[in-house]
Design a protein with these regions (language model features):
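Long, compositionally biased intrinsically disordered regions
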Residues: 299-300
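C-terminal/domain-terminus segments
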Residues: 253-263
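Accessory alpha-helical DNA-binding modules that contact the DNA backbone or grooves
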Residues: 156-159, 167-243, 262-266, 270-285, ...
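Noncatalytic, basic helical substrate-engagement surface that gates or grips nucleic-acid strands
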Residues: 1-119, 125-143, 235-254
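Alpha-helix N-cap/helix-start motif at coil-to-helix transitions, marked by capping-box chemistry
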Residues: 70-77, 154, 224-227
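Short, charged, surface-exposed secondary-structure boundary motifs
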Residues: 143-153
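Conserved active-site carboxylates
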Residues: 162
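Acidic, divalent-metal-coordinating active-site segment for phosphoryl/phosphodiester hydrolysis
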Residues: 123-124, 183
Length: 300
């Protein structure tokens, strides 16, 4: 059986929990047909991912793509069994992507939380950053708050969607606007560094008013359809989620958080022969999950 993705995922989640010591851990996956809404806006959305798998590959040579897909489906199903044993909440909502689920939960819990930390390498989450929401990039090992986003991009989080509408996103196969890079944006659109939301209407109005100032403004108008399309694709603050799905998310989040089930986790662990990855399972379970389990108990 192929469990490489499971071990990597559990190790990563465990390290994150130990490092940040949260009172609650929520994990979101893309739901079935999660990309459908964005593909209806742009048919080639994520087309570059057609043959990529969602869980990390194990060191295994598959004879066919079908064999690999079977292995990935097994890994995901098995991962769910492991997560069922841990004091975490996990969701995969049909018809929406993980980004949308996380954005909705962050919005719902914004006022009742001291701090929300989103763990992801996805820059789309920078648009959510404010005084309560921060984003941890595990690859860069860097925490993004409002100041960090401003320092790195010279763009305020409130205007991050518009900025990325110019630059695009190769990982999602979203094309940027050729000839308008970060430096050009900073020079001609300094308004994006302010906390005031700069809208598509503001952009269009300024470009029409400044055609004689620079060719950049004509280029913006020539590519406005692309910018507008990208804005719709990359905006996760709009919360274009069906009411029924929102209700389901709220229902799942309102349920008691499961308690740590050591016995079942250990059974799965030994069945999958994962001791080479975690040398001392009892210590890993105690040091990683016990405090989170104590918080979970308060929800019962």
């Amino acid at each position: 059986d192929h469990i490489g993705g499971i071990t990597g995922f559990l190790y990563s989640i465990g390290k994150t929990v130990r490092d940040f010591k949260p009172s609650r851990c929520v994990i979101a996956f893309d739901g079935q047909r999660g990309s459908a809404r964005r593909k209806s806006i742009y048919k080639d959305y994520k087309a570059n991912r057609a043959n990529k798998t969602k869980l990390r590959r194990h060191d295994h040579h598959f004879t066919t793509i079908e064999d690999e897909q079977v292995a990935m489906r097994f890994q995901f199903s098995r991962l769910v069994s492991y997560l069922d044993c841990l004091p975490v909440t996990f969701l995969a909502m049909d018809g929406i992507e993980a980004d949308d689920t996380i954005a909705y939960i962050a919005d719902q819990y914004h006022d009742k939380s001291k701090k929300i930390t989103i763990v992801s390498t996805d820059r789309d989450f920078y648009q959510l950053v404010d005084d309560k929401i921060q984003v941890w990039s595990p690859i860069k090992k860097k925490m993004y708050d409002t100041q960090t986003v401003l320092e790195e991009f010279n763009i305020h989080p409130n205007n991050m969607v518009l900025y990325r509408s110019f630059t695009g996103d190769k990982s999602d196969n979203i094309p940027g606007v050729s000839g308008i890079g970060p430096k050009t944006i900073q020079k001609h659109l300094p308004e994006l560094a302010a906390d005031k939301l700069y809208t598509l209407e503001d952009l269009q109005k300024k470009s029409k008013s400044n055609l004689n100032e620079s060719k950049t403004y004509q280029k913006i108008l020539d590519n406005f359809d692309t910018i507008e399309q990208n804005y719709k694709l990359m905006n996760i603050k709009l919360l274009n989620i069906p009411a029924a799905t929102c209700s389901k998310i709220r229902g799942i989040m309102a349920q008691p958080v499961p308690m740590l089930d050591r016995k079942e986790f250990q059974r799965l662990f030994y069945e999958d022969k994962m001791w080479s990855v975690m040398k001392n399972l009892p210590d890993w379970l105690t040091n990683t999950w016990l405090s989170l389990s104590a918080f979970a108990k308060q929800t019962h």
